[in-house]
C-alpha cells in the first residue's frame, strides 16, 4: 500500500471530500486508512463496558477507516499527488516519490 502512517492526505471522494488530515493508522490487508478528523462516526457504548476498563456508557464520536482509493497523499508543496517508487543507489531500497514533481516523500 502506498499510503503510510504519518502521511498527510487529502480526501478526494465521499462525504468528507476536500478534508486534509494525518494518517493515524494503515490497514494494508483491508486497503483502508484511519485519517485524523475524517469519517467520524458515533459509537454507542453500553454502561456495562465500564467494568472491562472502557469509558462510561454513552455515545462516543471517533474516526472510522476510509478506503485508500478515496485519499491522495499531499506532497511537500502541499498539493495532492500520486505515489511512485525509485530505487536508492546507496541503500538499494525503494523510496516513495511524488509523481507530480519527482521529489521524495
Curated annotation (Swiss-Prot):
SUPFAM superfamilies with a match to the protein in the record: Translation proteins SH3-like domain
Recorded GO CC terms: ribonucleoprotein complex; ribosome
Keyword flag Acyltransferase: no
Any GO MF annotation of the entry: structural constituent of ribosome
PROSITE patterns found in the cross-reference section: RIBOSOMAL_L24
Gene3D superfamilies in alphabetical order: 2.30.30.30
InterPro entries on file: KOW, Rib_uL2_dom2, Ribosomal_uL24, Ribosomal_uL24_CS, Ribosomal_uL24_KOW, Translation_prot_SH3-like_sf
Sorted UniProt keywords: Ribonucleoprotein, Ribosomal protein, RNA-binding, rRNA-binding
Pfam families associated with the record: KOW, ribosomal_L24
UniProt keyword annotation of RNA-binding present: yes
TM region positions: none
One example of a Gene Ontology biological process annotation: translation
Family: Belongs to the universal ribosomal protein uL24 family.
Assembly and oligomerization: Part of the 50S ribosomal subunit.
Role of this protein: One of two assembly initiator proteins, it binds directly to the 5'-end of the 23S rRNA, where it nucleates assembly of the 50S subunit. One of the proteins that surrounds the polypeptide exit tunnel on the outside of the subunit.
Name of the protein in its database record: Large ribosomal subunit protein uL24
Organism for this UniProt entry: Mycobacterium leprae (strain TN)
Originating gene: rplX
Amino acid at each position: 500500500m502506498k499510503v503510510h502512517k504519518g502521511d498527510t492526505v487529502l480526501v478526494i471522494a465521499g462525504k468528507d471530500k476536500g478534508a486534509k488530515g494525518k494518517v493515524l493508522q494503515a490497514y494494508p490487508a483491508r486497503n483502508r486508512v484511519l485519517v485524523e478528523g475524517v469519517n467520524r462516526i458515533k459509537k454507542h457504548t453500553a454502561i456495562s463496558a465500564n467494568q472491562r476498563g472502557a469509558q462510561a456508557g454513552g455515545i462516543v464520536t471517533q474516526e472510522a477507516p476510509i478506503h485508500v482509493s478515496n485519499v491522495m497523499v499531499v506532497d511537500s508543496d502541499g498539493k495532492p499527488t500520486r505515489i511512485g517508487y525509485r530505487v536508492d543507489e546507496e541503500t538499494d531500497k525503494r523510496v516513495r516519490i511524488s509523481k507530480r514533481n519527482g521529489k521524495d516523500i
